[in-house]
């Protein structure tokens, strides 16, 4: 069993590496979008909340696109049957796959984040806090995206429908991430605890609902 699990991890890690080019392209597009955003608002004075909200929304859509592409490729009807017949429950496979997607997105964000913050005119003193908050919130975003992506690829919906379905669950993440600007007035550890708790809440039902959607709607 341990050998099979190690083989599963190795296989998913290999798929993650192969998908890194697509993730790199997405973050290059994020840099372009950030540049356009900054140029459009260069004559307007605003607080950190506006560029931070823009960044989180863009990360939200990048995650949706990434998760949906991975699921469309890895959960085709033939591959799905192989996963179902594997020694592990589909929920475990979904969990491992989501973690690999998360690591892929997170590593690229850590690489690009200093440049993105400079482009968005966000003080680099926020770099560590933003990276930690993004690392915690991205966990929830990926698992939320997996639920809607499993429905989308099954029913052949479009990405716009996926974003609408996911948006209500993303709103708390967006709202609480804005509190980073009040880091002096609040305990930043409370924000970390919230994002961790929100992830655990999503973890409780996300793999189950994703597995159900893949099994029931893909046939």
Regions found by a protein language model. Give the residues of each.
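Helix-loop-helix units of permease transmembrane domains in multi-pass membrane transporters
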Residues: 70-101
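Membrane-interfacial helix-loop-helix connectors in multipass membrane proteins
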Residues: 42-46, 114-135, 181-192
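Hydrophobic alpha-helical transmembrane segments that constitute the membrane-spanning cores
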Residues: 95-121, 140, 144, 178
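Aromatic- and glycine-rich beta-strand/loop motifs that create alpha-glucan
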Residues: 1-26
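Hydrophobic alpha-helical transmembrane segments in multi-pass integral membrane proteins
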Residues: 170-184
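Junction motif at the cytosolic side of a transmembrane helix
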Residues: 202-219
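Long, hydrophobic alpha-helical segments
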Residues: 36, 51-68
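A structural motif at transmembrane helix-loop-helix junctions in multipass membrane proteins
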Residues: 133-167, 218-219
């Amino acid at each position: 069993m341990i050998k099979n699990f190690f083989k599963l991890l190795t296989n998913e890690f290999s798929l993650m590496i192969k998908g890194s080019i697509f993730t790199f392209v997405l973050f290059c597009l994020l840099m372009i979008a950030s540049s356009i955003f900054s140029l459009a608002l260069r004559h307007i004075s605003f607080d950190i909340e506006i560029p931070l909200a823009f960044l989180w929304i863009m990360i939200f859509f990048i995650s949706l696109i990434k998760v949906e592409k991975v699921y469309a490729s890895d959960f085709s009807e033939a591959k799905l049957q192989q996963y179902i017949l594997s020694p592990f429950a589909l929920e475990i496979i979904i969990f491992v796959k989501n973690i690999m997607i998360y690591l892929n997105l997170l590593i690229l964000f850590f690489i690009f984040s200093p440049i993105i913050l400079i482009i968005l005119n966000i003080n680099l003193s926020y770099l560590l806090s933003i990276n930690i908050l993004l690392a915690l919130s991205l966990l929830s975003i990926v698992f939320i995206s997996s639920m809607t992506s499993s429905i989308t690829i099954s029913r052949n919906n479009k990405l716009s429908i996926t974003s609408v379905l996911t948006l209500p669950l993303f709103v708390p993440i967006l709202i609480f991430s804005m509190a980073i600007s009040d880091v002096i007035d609040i305990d930043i550890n409370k924000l970390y605890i919230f994002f961790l708790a929100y992830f655990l809440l999503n973890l409780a039902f996300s793999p189950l609902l994703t597995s159900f959607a893949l099994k029931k709607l893909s046939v």
